[in-house]
Amino acid sequence: PSIFRDIDYLLISHDHFDHLDKPSVAKLVAGNPRMKLFCGIGTGRLIQGWFPGLQVIEAAWYQQYADGGLRLTFLPAQHWSKRGVRDGGERLWGAFMIEADHITIYNSGDTGYAHHFRELPELFPHIDYCMIGIGAYKPRWFMKPNHISPYDALTASADMHARVTIPMHYGTFDLSDEPLFDPPHVFQSEAKKRGQDIILPELGEIIKLKRFS
């Protein structure tokens, strides 16, 4: 689709199939010849093997990449990586901080709730938007270490002092026990109880992010 044109950077959080789909990346590469890939160590090597002409920037946790007024930082997440039988942990997973045009945006990637959220304000004292997963969270005894719940997503956003929380990672793949559209309903209800500002876009909706200062 035309909305996927003129992409400058493709951010891949980790190598799991629901986050790194080769046919989807192929379409993005074909439609965006100047697009660059920013990802964790090892993931770029895998993708560049599929698309040798793609410019790849790999990063370890806390490494930054600057391009004009844009700064990307690869950050820790509580998750894991694995694509085949014997490659578990070979590629680094993580989250992103995107700083551009006086707006700071956090993207959690896949993660469980952990201490890394509380550490973010030390490095990024003014986070405007927190994009964070809310789906694939049941049953909790199994999903809790690696997939954050709608409740913990709001707690994590508060931990990092984000102004606005935007949910993601729901309503696409049937990966867990909760109904596909349970997460946004729970998230919206809980955010209202806590008095936290959220943006809950429709799937596929384009939103324009505003500056706060």
What do the PLM-derived regions correspond to, one by one?
Residues 1-4, 59-125, 203-213:
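Core dinuclear metal-dependent hydrolase active-site scaffold
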Residues 2-29:
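Di-metal (Zn2+ and/or Mg2+/Mn2+) metal-binding site signature of metallo-dependent hydrolases
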Residues 9, 24, 36-38, 42-45, ...:
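Cap/insert and terminal regions of metallo-dependent hydrolase folds
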Residues 14-19, 79-81, 107, 147, ...:
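Histidine-centered active-site/metal-ligand motif
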Residues 16-17, 43-44, 63:
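Alpha-helix capping/helix-boundary segments
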Residues 47-58:
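Helix-loop-beta element that forms the nucleotide-linked donor phosphate-binding surface
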